[in-house]
Amino acid sequence: REFKAKLVGTDAKTDVAVLKIEATGLPTVAWADSDKLEVGEFVLAVGNPFGLTQTVTLGIVSALGRAAGIAEYEDFIQTDAAINPGNSGGALVNVRGELVGINTAIYSQSGGNMGIGFAVPSNMAHSIMEQLVQHGKVVRGWLGVSIQELTPELSSQFGVPKDVKGVLVSDIMDDSPAKKSGFERGDVIVEYDGKPMDSPAHLRNAVAQTVVGKKVTVKLIREKKPKSIELTIAEQPKNLSQAAAEDSGESIAPAGLLADIEVREVNSELAGRYGLKSSDHGVVVVRVKAGSQAEEAGVREGDLVLEVNRKSVGTIKSYEHVAANLPKDQAVLLLLKRQGRAIYLTLRP
């Protein structure tokens, strides 16, 4: 049977759309709770690969909470059930025939199945569907922080026990709920609204799915001490692009771990070269020695240096002063700004 469909709404950030057809008496699929899905559980992928209609393949859940870099909000179910071109939008169901996900993408070097497929979890898809049906668009919650993975090196720098999982706050946006409630750079978020947070993707998705106006409690670690902050979630701005000093011409590369990083004070020429904003003041990386520890750690030409070992370095002189007083044989913590985002990196001796 064929029906004419009307597009109710789309959400490009999750690759989910809702269509409406005029029909009655059609069977419907039951929704499963994807949060209860476990690695190793059997699943079936339904779709039309290569135009072969009503094809079903069997596999298992290979992993949960995957981020594949193909959508802005990702919490993919990874499966080895054969997913090929034409499966996108098809159902991923459990052995009871309940919907656990929507097939979205494959990882392939040949264009065909290689045993790695991804599906949007049913809980995320259901939340998106409800908003598209009710409002024709998706309204996402907003905390207003830049976050990154808490690596073992960063855990050590911020005094977080190795067995504690969390998400590191690298920056706070102006006029955001986080700013108004007292978040600080270097905070490590361990729990959001009663749920433990173990990755940036996990926290990003949790905040986005929070109802605007809801009060939530965020538990974090600051300066090695636990802390709780209560705040009200705001609506995510439409444009989330992260919301002039005189130059002496001097370029420096101090000794020690910073010896392989050459910096200069920002001027109009450097700002234009590296795409910095007129409001960006401080020192910018103009060279990183190839094959050095700094390059291996992720320092790049054009990075704006905001802090060294949590001390602000807004000028060449302040950078030199901090660099000259770094303790020997100890890791150095850098706070950099790259393409509008603040990130922490660790240089190890």
What are these regions (language model features)?
Residues 1-6, 13-14, 33-53:
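Short glycine/Trp-rich loop-beta-loop segment that forms part of the substrate-binding cleft
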Residues 28-30, 113-116, 190-193, 307-308:
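Second-shell loop/turn segments in exported
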Residues 26-28, 46-60, 65-89, 94-136, ...:
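Active-site loop architecture of trypsin-fold serine endopeptidases
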Residues 12-15, 85, 340-341:
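Short acidic/glycine-enriched loop/turn segments that link adjacent beta-strands
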Residues 15-21, 79:
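A generic structural motif
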Residues 1, 25, 55, 73, ...:
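Exposed loop/turn and edge beta-strand positions of beta-sandwich/beta-sheet ligand-binding modules
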Residues 29-31, 78-93, 174-178, 286-294:
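Gly/Ser-rich catalytic serine loop of serine hydrolases
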Residues 2-9, 20, 38-41, 99, ...:
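C-terminal recognition in membrane/secretory proteostasis and scaffolding
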